[in-house]
Amino acid sequence: MPDQGQPHVASLAAARGALRERGLRLILDFVPNHVAPDHPWVAAHPDYFIRGDAGDAARDPASFLDVDGHVFACGRDPFFPAWADVLQLNAFNPGLRAAIAATVNAIADQCDGVRCDMAMLMMNDVFERTWGQRAGARPAADYWPTLISAVRARHPGFRFLAEAYWDLEWALQQQGFDYCYDKRLYDRLREGHARPVREHLQAALDYQIKSARFLENHDEPRASASFDPRVHRAAAVITYFLPGLRFFHQGQFEGRKITYRELAADRGEEEAAVWREERRAAVVAEPEDLDDSTAGK
């Protein structure tokens, strides 16, 4: 974890304090499934990773990466090609589980919760289906209950939000998550048929209150661009007047119609990066008085 004396850590603490003054909590992003090839664990703890051999790297160089003579599996979602720029952590390794618990406890010293990227990938059932014998012996305890209980022993009020798909939201709620993405409701609203939406909302209240509702996020198109205006208003009423967590994306209130990725593709990465830095500086300088020159774009 970064040194508490580093400027960006101090800035994070200031941001957290400003949020608290406004009755808000700070949630940071946590990626449990994979790390970059230059992560210190690659050299110090290669057993924390799903491993391969020279044959794997030769047969499938898009899925296995040689790092200083050691072959590691690249991170992956089982339904898509591997992410060639990251290495897959082994959720079944007890040493990794202990290290992750220490890491998240350190993160919990600096914020009020974490959004867990692709949380379902670390569930025992999913991980075993994805990696088979490469993962080794399946632990008796599941990944998330073990981690969540370890963190809450030190930080009782710490919140866990799961990015979740494949209709595993309920299972993740039962494993300790405070909230899970309600991607199913989003998809049904996008499809525009009333009956599936109505049936979805008939789920039990204890499921509903732990659902995170959204109309856009960094992986989805802008709501202002993807919904017809009349449908958009109705979808917003349904989404944000339901029990549970209300999830809003940067730029959603201003009605932005393009994402940063689209901006980079349209204007070039350099111009998009300049715009992003200008926005960041504006937020730091005047967080309550922003002139958003991209509103409606």
Segments the model singles out, each with a brief description of its role:
Residues 1-297:
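Active-site and adjacent substrate-binding regions of carbohydrate-active enzymes
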